[in-house]
Regions:
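Enzymes that bind and transform nitrogen-containing heteroaromatic metabolites
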Residues: 1-158
Length: 158
C-alpha cells in the first residue's frame, strides 16, 4: 500500500511558514498510529519542519541538497524514493511538491479536514483530490478529535 496522508484547511492549506498552522493533538496521535512501522517519504522542507527523523518509521527524504541526519535516507527524486521504499507500506507525508507527484503512486489518500481558516498569501496549498482518479469514501467524524472530519479516497480501478 502506498498512501498520502495530510490535514487540510477549508482553503486547501497544509502549511504556513514552515509549520502546520493549527494544533490538533488527536490528529497527530492518529498520524503517529497509522504511520508507525511504515516507510514515510517527505520533502526537505517537511523534514526541516520536524528537525529529525520520525521515530519508529523508516524515513526517506527527497532533496537535492546534502543532508546528514541520523536514521534518514536521502534521494534526489520521488521516483527513487518509491523504488528505495520497496514493497512495504509507504506514506507520503508532504510537502506540497511531494503530494503533487505522489498521486501517481498512491493507492489511497487519507485526508483530515480541519476547521481552522488560513488566509495568508504565504500559505502552502495542496490541490483538491482528483475524484476522476480517486473514489471518495464517506466523510466521517475523526475518531481521535471531535470537530474534525476525515475522508479516505481510494484509487479507481475502472
Amino acid at each position: 500500500m502506498r498512501g498520502m496522508i495530510y490535514a487540510v484547511s477549508p482553503e486547501g492549506v497544509i502549511g504556513l511558514g514552515g509549520k502546520i498552522p493549527w494544533h490538533h493533538p488527536g490528529d497527530v496521535r492518529r498520524f503517529q498510529r497509522i504511520t508507525e512501522g511504515t516507510t514515510v517519504i517527505m520533502g526537505r522542507a517537511t523534514f526541516d519542519e520536524t528537525g529529525k527523523a520520525l521515530p519508529r518509521r523508516r524515513n526517506i527524504v527527497v532533496t537535492s541538497r546534502p543532508l546528514h541526519a541520523p536514521d534518514v535516507e536521502t534521494v534526489p527524486t520521488l521516483a527513487e524514493a518509491v523504488a528505495r521504499a520497496g514493497d512495504g507500506d509507504v506514506w507520503f507525508i508532504g510537502g506540497a511538491r511531494i503530494f503533487d507527484e505522489a498521486a501517481a503512486w498512491a493507492d489511497v489518500i487519507d485526508v483530515t479536514y480541519v476547521p481552522d481558516h488560513v488566509d495568508d498569501p504565504r500559505a502552502v496549498h495542496v490541490p483538491p483530490v482528483d475524484e476522476t482518479r480517486f473514489e471518495p469514501g464517506p466523510l466521517v467524524p475523526h475518531e481521535d478529535e471531535p470537530g474534525l472530519f476525515r475522508r479516505v479516497y481510494r484509487r479507481r480501478t475502472d
